[in-house]
């Protein structure tokens, strides 16, 4: 898995949590009653978030 900075990690998880809260499907099985932020963190830990980071070279 790619090593992200803390800023990239925060941006990816925050963006994904917003997507989930707006109705996007969750890409993993989550227990009932979980918040969008917790779901986004679980997705990030499993490496299934469909967001890429492009760094300038």
From Swiss-Prot:
What's the top EC group for this one?
A: transferase
Q: Where is the signal peptide?
A: none
A Pfam family assignment: RNA_pol_Rpb6
Enumerate the Gene Ontology biological process terms.
transcription by RNA polymerase I; transcription by RNA polymerase II; tRNA transcription by RNA polymerase III
The question of whether Cell inner membrane is a record keyword is answered with no
Q: Which SUPFAM superfamilies match?
A: RPB6/omega subunit-like
Q: Which UniProt keywords apply?
A: Cytoplasm, DNA-directed RNA polymerase, Nucleotidyltransferase, Transcription, Transferase
Please tell me one Gene Ontology term that the record gives under cellular component.
Answer: DNA-directed RNA polymerase complex
InterPro entries named in the record: DNA-dir_RNA_polK_14-18kDa_CS, Pol_omega/Rpo6/RPB6, RPB6/omega-like_sf, Rpo6/Rpb6
Where found? Cytoplasm
Report a single Gene Ontology molecular function.
DNA binding
E.C. number, please?
Answer: 2.7.7.6
Q: Which reaction does it catalyse?
A: RNA(n) + a ribonucleoside 5'-triphosphate = RNA(n+1) + diphosphate
How does the annotation summarize its subunit structure?
A: Part of the RNA polymerase complex.
State the family it belongs to: Belongs to the archaeal Rpo6/eukaryotic RPB6 RNA polymerase subunit family.
Q: So what does this one do? A: DNA-dependent RNA polymerase (RNAP) catalyzes the transcription of DNA into RNA using the four ribonucleoside triphosphates as substrates.
Q: What is this protein called?
A: DNA-directed RNA polymerase subunit Rpo6
Lineage of origin: Archaea, Methanobacteriati, Methanobacteriota, Thermococci, Thermococcales
